[in-house]
Amino acid sequence: MSTEKTKLGVHSEAGKLRKVMVCSPGLAHQRLTPSNCDELLFDDVIWVNQAKRDHFDFVTKMRERGIDVLEMHNLLTETIQNPEALKWILDRKITADSVGLGLTSELRSWLESLEPRKLAEYLIGGVAADDLPASEGANILKMYREYLGHSSFLLPPLPNTQFTRDTTCWIYGGVTLNPMYWPARRQETLLTTAIYKFHPEFANAEFEIWYGDPDKDHGSSTLEGGDVMPIGNGVVLIGMGERSSRQAIGQVAQSLFAKGAAERVIVAGLPKSRAAMHLDTVFSFCDRDLVTVFPEVVKEIVPFSLRPDPSSPYGMNIRREEKTFLEVVAESLGLKKLRVVETGGNSFAAEREQWDDGNNVVCLEPGVVVGYDRNTYTNTLLRKAGVEVITISASELGRGRGGGHCMTCPIVRDPIDY
């Protein structure tokens, strides 16, 4: 029997997608209310059953293209059947700092009593005061409910797990475990790390950890996968805006260069706004040489290049590029220029379609993308440029501000020959 380990890694943005992780809407989204959705980074509550149907349609369309789609609830359910994995998660989630001294043992013993599928649901979906049986920590729980309310959370829900792109990012032969910008999202990295550490799909595979540790306080160093694109030719694009900081970007680049995994990191200096929270909300690849962009933001991007430099104390040098971001990206891939499809429609329509993730498409293979149906102007322009656009419904899935690119964490993707 072969003992050779499976190799995981993402080697381009437009090569054939082989394996991807997603997370279906579920209990966490049922917890969203008009009073808490802003804190949980959703613009509105969603019709959860319809969102589930639309997400299943998204998964089905990827599987029809031969892509191995892994769903996070399922992965977590299988992971926590390993007692060591369950202990690792609960030791970090059920603490006096997160739950309070009076309920740690009660909450933990109740969670440990659940069957794995239900437990995984609560780890992602959160635990409300009313979920815990009254017999568990009865007096303290009674006071907690009376003071904070029956719908207050002992463990907050994680509805943004729907956007698996951000929590970790696979860059060539390894992965980053991202310290997220908003507190509402930081526990997502813990759960994904547990999957990578203990689930057989990953525990028996070969890959590097480039950066990040959920056991560590990273301070001002934050990174989210929507900003990170390994585009091929040894190049990585990283957006530096609202969510990903220069502190994290420098450390990722240093790690990649030290292992010879990348030859250049192009930093895209973005304006700090929710509409352009990540690089992939204004720029994404649709083919080996074709990108879709929101020009109002992309033309303002300030590009910097980081390259290995053994003579530097930090092993790299940095310079501000004189050319535009699109010119720098094209040059890094050995292309004369990129074919560019801008957000469609007049100025009003283009702003609406960018807000509705018109430029946030995921490439399944060269020239084939998945995008939201509502972005009709942009989708039409992509089709005229020769791109096959597979559409999914945006009515519910888009309320968290993320499209096909945001809702996928590629784990294995083929390189492109530039």
From Swiss-Prot:
GO terms for biological process: arginine catabolic process to ornithine; arginine deiminase pathway. One of its GO terms (molecular function) is arginine deiminase activity. GO terms for cellular component: cytoplasm. Belongs to the arginine deiminase family. It is an enzyme of class 3 (hydrolase). It catalyses: L-arginine + H2O = L-citrulline + NH4(+). Activated by Mg(2+) or Mn(2+) and strongly inhibited by Zn(2+). Keywords: Arginine metabolism, Cytoplasm, Hydrolase. Homotetramer (Possible). It comes from Pseudomonas aeruginosa (strain ATCC 15692 / DSM 22644 / CIP 104116 / JCM 14847 / LMG 12228 / 1C / PRS 101 / PAO1). This is Arginine deiminase.
